[in-house]
């Protein structure tokens, strides 16, 4: 075992060997100590904190509130698109708030900053402001509805007290009324200023007058139509017991004309205003003069003899027809016979068209 007292470091400086003193007395270079070498110090990057001051700045929550008003959310069925629009809005806001920051670090920062008392107070103030605006709008709407109901009731009371006259009634007796404003809508409204009368009252009064005129016009037209139908039924009843057109004109047999029977043309109403048509001249010349006395009969020249083989039979000229008026043509349509297959020959006219024609004829007579 070594003796500790014999070691060089265990002795004092006086007792130490000379070799150890020579080693400690040698000078050292600066390069070896590292004094002249440059030391690079890394500077820590300053990260802006999301505190209350930055959140209340113009680029903070006020800017976010302004951006929310510009976002158009479509709602049901467009959830994915609405989420993309919200993310774009928050990304723009975070870029203005932290120009060199990352969007991934936005959520933890905003979540921590939203728990402060200042931000909570600002959010509650915004909620109260929106509720007050909504309540004010509801109250204004209720007041407007109440005013409309009151105005409608006032107009209803005025219409009940105001006398109404139709075109067929007698005109009212004119009385002298003191009118303050010549522009008043109703006569007798002295206490109402003409500037307080709205355009809606004028439109209502014009609509009431127009409807009254339409009702009176329809009543006049219906009365004229009823009179025309009654006259037509009366004419049909008068002509039902008279001769029809199928028993007149060319329907008679030649024997009846030889017996001297007179035929009538167009006298289907039995008025007797039409004279019987005389027989043609060709028929009177061919009749035998046996009914006349021989003394009064003038001598007749003998007819020239012609060979019967070359002579063509003489035909009587056609009898001229008298043109019928519109009323007789309408009666002729009533006496036409009905065909069994009338639907196959021609379509049956619609009765509504016939009534429309009558209505148009009556309106032309009135000059409408």
Curated annotation (Swiss-Prot):
One of its GO terms (molecular function) is DNA binding. It comes from the Eukaryota. Residues 153-167 have a biased composition (Basic and acidic residues). Residues 291-307 have a biased composition (Pro residues). Its main location: nucleus. One of its GO terms (biological process) is meiotic cell cycle. This is Chromosome segregation in meiosis protein 3. It comes from Yarrowia lipolytica (strain CLIB 122 / E 150).
């Amino acid at each position: 075992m070594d003796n500790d007292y014999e070691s060089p470091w265990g002795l004092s400086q006086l007792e130490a060997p000379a070799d150890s003193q020579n080693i400690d007395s040698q000078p050292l270079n600066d390069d070896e100590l590292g004094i002249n070498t440059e030391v690079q110090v890394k500077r820590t990057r300053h990260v802006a904190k999301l505190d209350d001051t930055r959140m209340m700045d113009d680029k903070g929550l006020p800017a976010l509130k302004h951006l929310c008003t510009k976002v158009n959310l479509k709602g049901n069925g467009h959830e994915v698109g609405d989420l993309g629009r919200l993310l774009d809005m928050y990304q723009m806001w975070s870029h203005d708030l932290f120009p060199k920051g990352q969007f991934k670090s936005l959520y933890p920062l905003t979540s921590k900053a939203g728990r402060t008392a200042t931000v909570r107070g600002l959010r509650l103030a915004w909620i109260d402001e929106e509720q007050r605006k909504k309540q004010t709008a509801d109250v204004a709407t209720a007041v407007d509805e109440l005013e409309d109901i009151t105005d409608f009731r006032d107009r209803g009371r005025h219409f009940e007290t105001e006398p109404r006259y139709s075109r067929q009634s007698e005109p009212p007796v004119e009385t002298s009324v003191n009118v303050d404003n010549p522009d008043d809508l109703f006569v007798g409204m002295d206490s109402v200023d003409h500037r307080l009368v709205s355009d809606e009252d004028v439109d209502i009064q014009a609509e009431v007058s127009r409807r009254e005129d339409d009702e009176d016009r329809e009543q006049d037209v219906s009365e004229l139509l009823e009179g025309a139908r009654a006259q037509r039924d009366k004419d049909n009843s008068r002509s039902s017991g008279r001769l029809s057109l199928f028993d007149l004109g060319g329907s008679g047999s030649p024997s009846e004309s030889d017996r001297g029977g007179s035929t009538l043309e167009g006298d289907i109403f039995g008025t007797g205003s039409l004279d019987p048509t005389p027989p043609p001249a060709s028929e009177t010349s061919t009749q035998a003069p046996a009914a006349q006395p021989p003394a009064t009969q003038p001598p007749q020249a003998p007819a020239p003899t012609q060979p019967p083989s070359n002579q063509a039979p003489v035909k009587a000229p056609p009898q001229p027809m008298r043109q019928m008026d519109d009323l007789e043509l309408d009666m002729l349509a009533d006496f036409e016979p009905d065909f069994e297959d009338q639907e196959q020959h021609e379509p049956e006219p619609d009765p509504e068209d016939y009534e429309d024609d009558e209505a148009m004829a009556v309106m032309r007579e009135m000059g409408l």
